[in-house]
Amino acid sequence: MNLKDVDKSEFTPMMQQYIECKENYPDAIVFFRIGDFYEMFFEDAYIASRELEIALTGKDAGYKERVPMCGIPFHAYSGYAEKLISKGYKVAIVEQVEDPSQAKGLVKRDVVKIITPGTITEAGLNEKENNFLAAIYETDARYTLAYADVSTGQMYLTTIEDEEALANEILSLHAKEVICLSSLKLKILNTLHDNYQIVISRCDDTSLIDDYKYLIEGLNLEKFKDDIPCISILICLLYTSPSPRD
């Protein structure tokens, strides 16, 4: 069963809630908290069942067919998430975001955390290795590369003239994830993803430009405006701990 081929209105309210979370984070495996388990549905269930070697079952959700499902104990999620991250996936954690005693009907749930290869800081992370998240920005026929280790807070910036040198620098960092604007077209991005399992995350150009303007003006960073990949990393790191939506 494919999520894109079904009508959301035909499902139970809880499954509609899951579908809304998945629609907001389509490139992540959604861990949807139900009681003492995180459950995955539809395509995510197929992927998680295969990659985590756990049983694939089904769930009655008001639809004419049972929805593909698999689940893991909530207290053990970090190990399962780390395994998915090591295989190049992203994980979105969905929790209840309101007090059940105050809820009118179904308790509201939303994504409270996103774990990616470049932002994982759980206990399972190898402390002997840097865990670099990199950002690329193209300007005036050159590339600015910013990279940060979110587990230590270290951040660096460099300018590179051509694609091949850029790829070599990223590989030398053993970067787990590269962030760039959606409009950036570089052949090396496919190579980094396909041959080296580096996750490529794209950020919306318009929203980031608005964020750059706010940060540059609000924090008096005008002299650093050509180095905005650093700012893009900060913005995308904030994005990995999303606030509940209204």
Ranges and model annotations:
Residues 242-246:
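A short, hydrophobic C-terminal helix/tail in secreted or cell-surface proteins
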Residues 1-241:
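Charged catalytic and DNA/RNA-contacting regions of genome-maintenance
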